[in-house]
């Protein structure tokens, strides 16, 4: 069956968008709240009608992720900001493989995310309460699966508990996109042998996104 590179590119952009958020938060303590909302909201949509539905049915919501994906695919440097983004992206992919191999962890993840629905009746998605709950799911279910993702940034910024929670919540969103990517036929070999196809798709989607 032919791969749907449009959907695969969307999910990859979702992973890269999470990596971008982690980098921004770790270095500055801040990020674009609209971008963060798209990523965190993707965690809650476990039965989407389509890949794009995971991200609010709007390609524009993944603009940052698509730009980040192009940066990763077009760089050969192993230093600096681009290397950080690549490391976060590939670390998320590696962690998802460990998650997929453990049915108990997958079940627990689904259960914990389901429990958030009650809290969301009373709190906004970007509230400290919900962000902390998402971070706790990452710590309890994902970070126990293997070597922890080493987040690099400003030591002062990373001491802030609210920043830590947002970073972990963004990493959980990255895992969500990685699960989706695998479900729709994504695989590591594509990142080596199908780069031109992924770059073409990402550029075509970005061309449809209005400039702000």
Curated annotation (Swiss-Prot):
Superkingdom assignment: Bacteria
Keywords on record: Cell inner membrane, Cell membrane, Coiled coil, Cytoplasm, Membrane
Alphabetical list of InterPro entries matching this protein: HflD, HflD-like_sf
Stored Pfam families: DUF489
Record membrane topology: Peripheral membrane protein
Annotated transmembrane regions: none
Main location: cytoplasm
SUPFAM superfamilies assigned to the protein according to its UniProt record, in alphabetical order: YcfC-like (SSF101322)
Assigned GO CC terms: cytoplasm; plasma membrane
Family under the similarity heading: Belongs to the HflD family.
Name recorded for this polypeptide: High frequency lysogenization protein HflD homolog
Organism expressing this protein natively: Pectobacterium atrosepticum (strain SCRI 1043 / ATCC BAA-672)
């Amino acid at each position: 069956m032919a791969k749907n590179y449009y959907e695969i590119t969307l999910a990859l952009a979702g992973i890269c968008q999470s990596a971008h958020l982690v980098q921004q938060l770790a270095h500055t303590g801040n990020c674009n709240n609209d971008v963060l909302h798209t990523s965190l909201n993707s965690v809650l949509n476990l039965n989407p009608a389509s890949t794009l539905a995971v991200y609010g049915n709007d390609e524009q919501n993944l603009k940052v992720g698509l730009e980040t994906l192009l940066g990763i695919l077009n760089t050969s440097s192993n230093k600096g900001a681009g290397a950080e983004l690549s490391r976060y992206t590939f670390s998320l992919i590696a962690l998802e493989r460990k998650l997929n191999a453990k049915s108990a962890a997958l079940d627990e993840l689904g259960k914990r995310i389901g429990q958030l629905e009650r809290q969301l009746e009373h709190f906004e998605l970007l509230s400290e309460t919900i962000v902390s709950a998402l971070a706790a799911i990452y710590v309890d279910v994902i970070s126990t699966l293997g070597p922890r993702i080493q987040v690099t940034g400003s030591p002062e910024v990373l001491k802030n508990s609210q920043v830590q929670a947002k970073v972990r919540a963004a990493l959980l969103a990255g895992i969500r996109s990685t699960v989706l990517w695998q479900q729709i036929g994504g695989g590591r070999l594509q990142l080596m042998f199908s780069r031109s196809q992924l770059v073409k798709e990402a550029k075509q989607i970005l061309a449809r996104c209005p400039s702000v």
